[in-house]
Amino acid sequence: MSDNEKETQVAEETQNTQATAESSNNDERRGRRNNRGGEGRRGDRRGRREDNHENEMLDRVVTINRVSKTHKGGRTFSFAALVVVGDGNGTVGVGYGKSREVPAAIAKGQLDAKKHLFNVPRIRGTVTHPVTGHDHAGTVMLRPAAPGTGVIAGSAVRAVMECAGITDILTKSMGSATAVNVVRATVDALKQLEEPEEIAARRGLSVQEVAPDQLLRERAAGIAEARKAREEAKAEAAAKDGE
C-alpha cells in the first residue's frame, strides 16, 4: 500500500469518527431539549394562570385632568389620571397617576390602585348596612338595595361599585362634585362597612341579636351561590386543562 493510499484511509477514518461524535452530540442535545420542553410547558401554564389572574382585574378611568406647571423657561403640561381597579368580587382600590403622556398616567394610576386594594363586605351583591363617607367637602351615602335594583349612582361612584362587585345599591352624593372627592368619599364609606360578626364581637352580643333574620338568610343564600359558582369555575378549568 502506497503512502497516498494510507493517508486517504486515515482521513476517511477520521471523518467517520467526527461524524459519529457529531451525531451523538446532536442526539444528546435533542434529548435535553425534549426534557426541557415539559418544564417549559409547565412554566408556560403557570405563566398563563398569572396572566389570566391579571386579566380578570377590572379597571375604570374615572377622570383625566390636564395639569400645567410654570417654570422660569415656560410652562410644562402633564396629565393626571384617577383610576379604579378591582376584581369584581369584593376587592377594590383607587389610584392616582401623573405623567406627560395619557397612557403612562393611566398605567401609573393602575399600579397605585393595586397597591391600595381592600376588601368590601357584601351580601348578595349589596352592602351590609347603610353608611356615609366623607372627603373634604364631598359626602357620599350608601344604602342596601334589593336584588334587581341595580346601581343607582353617578359615574364616579358607579365605577367604584362595578369594580367592587356591588350590583344593587342606592347612593347619593352631596357637596363637592369633584371626581376625586366623590371617589375618595365612596372609598371612605366602603371602608366603614363591617360584617355582622365584627359588630356582635364589639358589642358583646350574638350575631342573631345584631343582624336581622332576613339579612342572615340572604347572606347564607349568597354564600351558597358563591360556592356553587366556584365549583363550576373549577370544573371548567379542570376540563380545559384536560384538553
Curated annotation (Swiss-Prot):
Concerning Gene3D superfamilies, the annotation shows: 3.30.160.20, 3.30.230.10
Which InterPro entries does the protein's record reference?
A: Ribosomal_Su5_D2-typ_SF, Ribosomal_uS5, Ribosomal_uS5_bac-type, Ribosomal_uS5_C, Ribosomal_uS5_N, Ribosomal_uS5_N_CS, Ribsml_uS5_D2-typ_fold_subgr
- Disulfide bond positions: none
Q: Which GO terms describe its biological process?
A: translation
PROSITE patterns the UniProt entry points to:
RIBOSOMAL_S5, S5_DSRBD
The keyword Mitochondrion belongs to this UniProt entry's keyword annotation: no
- Locate the region Disordered: 1-54
Q: Which GO terms describe its molecular function?
A: rRNA binding; structural constituent of ribosome
Q: Would you tell me the Gene Ontology cellular component terms?
A: small ribosomal subunit
Alphabetic keyword roster: Ribonucleoprotein, Ribosomal protein, RNA-binding, rRNA-binding
Composition bias (Polar residues) maps to 11-24
Q: Which family does it belong to?
A: Belongs to the universal ribosomal protein uS5 family.
Q: What is known of its domains?
A: The N-terminal domain interacts with the head of the 30S subunit; the C-terminal domain interacts with the body and contacts protein S4. The interaction surface between S4 and S5 is involved in control of translational fidelity.
UniProt protein name: Small ribosomal subunit protein uS5
